[in-house]
Amino acid sequence: MNVKQIRENMTEAALSVESVMRGHPRITLQELSTACSISLPAVEFIIEQMLCMRVAQRGAFGRYTLTPEYQNGSF
């Protein structure tokens, strides 16, 4: 799947998480939950899906960021 196809299939909640992650690299799950007004379990589920699809990556200190490939659209 390319970036356009992935974004077309995202829920509103996932698009919200992705949007916040674009503006705040290296963000925690709790910070995402607060910024998006989405429950922590829902954010965890969305992030796990993003990790499986290689849209996001987990840093050493439990912070998450979008992968450079996804950000650049060269997925």
Language model features: what each stretch is:
Residues 3-14, 28, 55-75:
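Short, cationic-aromatic polyanion-contact patches
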Residues 7-35, 45:
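Short amphipathic alpha-helical interface segments
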Residues 24, 49-53:
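Alpha-helix C-caps/helix-loop-beta hinges
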Residues 38-49:
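Short amphipathic alpha-helical interaction segments
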